[in-house]
Amino acid sequence: MSTLKKISDEDRESKFGYVFAVSGPVVTAERMSGSAMYELVRVGYYELVGEIIRLEGDMATIQVYEETSGVTVGDPVLRTGKPLSVELGPGIMGSIFDGIQRPLKDINELTSSIYIPKGVNIPCLSRTQSWGFNPLNVKVGSHITGGDLYGLVHENTLVKHKLLVPPRAKGTVRYIAPPGNYTVDDIILETEFDGEINKWSMLQVWPVRQPRPVTEKLPANHPLLTGQRVLDSLFPCVQGGTTAIPGAFGCGKTVISQALSKYSNSDVIIYVGCGERGNEMSEVLRDFPELSVEIDGVTESIMKRTALVANTSNMPVAAREASIYTGITLSEYFRDMGYNVSMMADSTSRWAEALREISGRLAEMPADSGYPAYLGARLASFYERAGRVKCLGNPEREGSVSIVGAVSPPGGDFSDPVTSATLGIVQVFWGLDKKLAQRKHFPSINWLISYSKYMRALDDFYDKNFQEFVPLRTKVKEILQEEEDLSEIVQLVGKASLAETDKITLEVAKLLKDDFLQQNSYSAYDRFCPFYKTVGMLRNMIGFYDMARHAVETTAQSENKITWNVIRDSMGNILYQLSSMKFKDPVKDGEAKIKADFDQLYEDLQQAFRNLED
């Protein structure tokens, strides 16, 4: 949304339409013939930003991205001739935008008010800040096409901002700027094609509703490691995957999406707060600058790899719809540089409610629960922009966009239209459970209803790096499922009447639930669990289960048979060690020490069972 024309600048009256009717955020204007769908307009004397969403004859229906009080019939409407676009260039990382990419910090400094004034017209990326530009191996006379890398800007210590030729440009280089400091408006590249000369600065403008082109889509094969044990082990997502986190209020959706943005193995994070409470965004803004990530032994603030699109519930409804598109376009831009990007959308239900409100104002036919009939198609067109791709241009590189969408169905009802439409599209479903959250079991992921369709795609990765992992995961799922089946019997007849092997299943399931699936995201040792620690914990717990069952089954016929009570009484120390594996701190103890401790515990296990059977 670069600086648009003002009404006072326009000298031709034919460029004006006039307001015909106002209904909340929807304005109808007449004498608008010649305008295009999704064209940006400025409405009224306050010059509010709006977008044309319907054309009939010379009447245009406009959704306005700001408060429309004070707009009257007969006010001028200025056409700008551009679609809703975002500015792409150095300066995105670490900034906070609203739904149509207005920089909130700059607006605050300009107006020294906590509110955004009407019709504020300020560039999205700073025009005065200069960036150190280094050309790559592009010289005068080189031939370049869309997507080629021609320069580097060290935007900050975490992100190298690679400058790309815009996707539709091509030609022979006539001029490339020498290394030095430039602002985003300075011309740093000139190309010539068919006698036509084009000048390019660091800044690109791209329409948000249009996906950025790629060479081809690739199958995903690398996991998106979240640092949450239950997700990494049982329901993994891939880099370039789509995930939904539905859950009622207070189940911890926001905490999971924040944990993803803090600890996942992504290069760039785009966090879109779309219609959620303002306090949640301010919590992100308070926490993120203090958090750090260690890259190559250097500690850096996480804010350096994050951009926030804040469109909270007290901002105008229409901009909520745009904020999701703004976020995904920013993500695609960083993907084109060859980065792995994660985009968090919190929450897509509020976005769907914005669609519902605007659809209602347009008097369209409502479908299920009053949502528009095209809800599924809109959701799909958003989630389809995720994926791992081969980027346009040279040098060859791969990037990915992973989308994690939080869904807040009213009352935690998963048959809600938004949830069911989302589940038909996404490949990973992390279902949050109100009952688990009330028991203070966090992350409150219900391991019986959640699923991931990427298991098969990740088998190669596990075979190469963690060979023992896949059978362990299968065993965990079996134990948890068996425990669910046994729990009904236990409620009827009590634990004492169960078979010995079933008692072991129940106890190991309890161990898994309390000390493996549960994770305290506010503690130093457990807020992030690396994958080697996850696998090590699983190996010891399942090793204990297998050995205990083996001991019980082999001595079932003999005179001194081993029962669960015998095992529990003689192995109190080992059970305590199993449940305290999570207290190993990956930062303080380091990978080698934790692995050695886990291997030692496994040997102690084997020794203890040998002693027991003798």
From Swiss-Prot:
Tell me its EC number(s), please. 7.1.2.2
> What name does UniProt use for this protein?
V-type proton ATPase catalytic subunit A
Give the matching Pfam families: ATP-synt_ab, ATP-synt_ab_N, ATP-synt_ab_Xtn, ATP-synt_VA_C
Could you tell me which species this protein originates from? Aedes aegypti (Yellowfever mosquito)
Q: Does Kinase show up as a keyword for this record?
A: no
Q: Where are the transmembrane segments?
A: none
Annotated catalysed reactions: ATP + H2O + 4 H(+)(in) = ADP + phosphate + 5 H(+)(out)
Q: Which GO terms describe its cellular component?
A: lysosomal membrane; proton-transporting V-type ATPase, V1 domain
